Amino acid sequence: MAKSSDSLNKKLLAAAVGATKAKDIKELIEKGADINTHNEWGLTPIMLAAQYNRSVVVAKALIEAGADIHEAEPKYRSNALHLAADNTTNPKVIEVLLDAGANLDARNYLGETALIMAVNSNTETKIATTLIKLGADINARDYQGHSVLDYAKLAKRTYLVNLLKEKGAV
């Protein structure tokens, strides 16, 4: 990879985390940055945006430029939707990924779906409720057999426990 391309790719990875405007992303792509470049941990710009950036316009710009929303990072095999479910505070980021075709019930290497990750790790209840509203499998179980409801109980997420039961989760 040419030094200038490497520099552009590093700038794109940084912009995915911190940019607030679509133009910041588009300019780097137009200059030749690789939309699916990887950082040292194997994360792509869309994964970083989903995990750290709450900006819907940045996520949309990356997707419109051809970001692979299905690619999974190498360590845990989590994709952009998993990372957003685990970390974002903006449910619109979840919606943008799903509108672009992200698999709502894709599993990482532990068998966790985005909903399991949201219930287990994300303190923003609205992320889990958004996933439920959009049709996530409320009876999904990880590879150890723990259900979404199990994780909600373990995390003492009373509102989610009640919502899941109301929706028929077991």
Q: Where on the chain are the PLM-derived regions?
A:
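Ankyrin-repeat and related helical/solenoid repeat scaffolds used for protein-protein interactions
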Residues: 107-155
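Ankyrin-repeat-protein effector appendages
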Residues: 1-12, 100, 134, 143-144, ...
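Ankyrin repeat A-helix N-terminal signature
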Residues: 14-20, 48-55, 83-90, 117-124, ...
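Ankyrin-repeat boundary/"N-cap" motif
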Residues: 5-14, 38-45, 72-80, 107-113, ...
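Intrinsically disordered, low-complexity regulatory segments in ankyrin-centric signaling systems
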Residues: 1-31, 39-43, 47, 60, ...
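Conserved ankyrin/ankyrin-like repeat signature
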Residues: 24, 57-58, 92-93, 126-127, ...
